[in-house]
Regions:
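Single-residue signature of alpha-solenoid repeat helices
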Residues: 20, 68, 116, 166, ...
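Short solvent-exposed coil/turn linkers within tandem alpha-helical repeat scaffolds
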Residues: 27-35, 72-95, 126-144, 172-184
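Generic signature of mature, soluble extracytoplasmic domains
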Residues: 128-129, 155-163, 167, 171-177
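Start-of-domain marker
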Residues: 3-64
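Short, intrinsically disordered, charge-balanced linker/junction segments flanking boundaries
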Residues: 1-2, 194-204
């Protein structure tokens, strides 16, 4: 078993992600090590990498990416210089955003609608976090309202029979006056919903 963080880094470099996770979890179970900023960054990298491993059960992927996000945030709290994140230009966050977005679609296609909704919501949360920090990436530009992501979350919420959440997401689109053929169903859905509730004010 790895005894120090350099050993764990070596395991990670060899793509031994399962073993690396066991090792980093054991390493960080010691209170002193749990205050090591490098350990939190490494945990984030390990957990996110393991989430892409073909042998990882799909049911574990969401939690691994969720915990990776929390680990990167903890790293930044402990390292005022933000060295590792600056070296990678904060791309771990972008990777988590894209990974959770894709996971939401994957769960949706598998008819796991609750899991799909959770993944889309987490992707949106990470996107909002990235924008709040003003991180920018050469390969993609993120926007405050990711219309496709919000629509996907709304549709997943409908399928999961979580209508209150679906309405919240649909309203994000209509409140922003999003238009086009792809979004006609949004206005039709809300009109039908509020008509059934006799809520004329919300129809305006």
């Amino acid at each position: 078993m790895a005894q120090d963080i350099d050993d764990i880094k070596d395991m990670m470099a060899k793509s031994q992600f399962k073993e690396s996770k066991v090792a980093i979890d054991k390493y960080m179970s010691t209170p002193k090590n749990a205050e090591n900023s490098d350990a939190w960054y490494l945990k984030g990298r390990i957990y996110n990498s393991l989430s892409y491993d073909n042998t990882t059960p799909e049911s574990d992927v969401y939690n691994l990416r969720n915990e990776a996000f929390a680990a990167f945030q903890k790293y930044q709290q402990l390292d005022p210089k933000d060295l590792w994140m600056k070296l990678e230009n904060f791309e771990s966050y972008l990777n988590l955003y894209g990974g959770l977005y894709d996971l939401g679609a994957k769960f949706y296609n598998a008819k796991s609608y609750d899991a799909s909704l959770n993944a889309f919501k987490k992707a949106n949360e990470i996107k909002d976090f990235i924008l709040s920090k003003k991180y920018e990436f050469n390969q993609v530009k993120l926007y405050p309202l990711d219309t496709a992501l919000v629509l996907n979350a709304a549709v997943a919420a409908v399928q999961a029979k979580k209508m209150d959440e679906a309405i919240i997401f649909y309203r994000k689109l209509t409140d922003a006056n999003v238009g086009g053929k792809d979004y006609e169903e949004v206005y039709e859905f809300l009109a039908d919903h509020y008509s059934k509730k006799n809520d004329e004010a919300s129809l305006m």
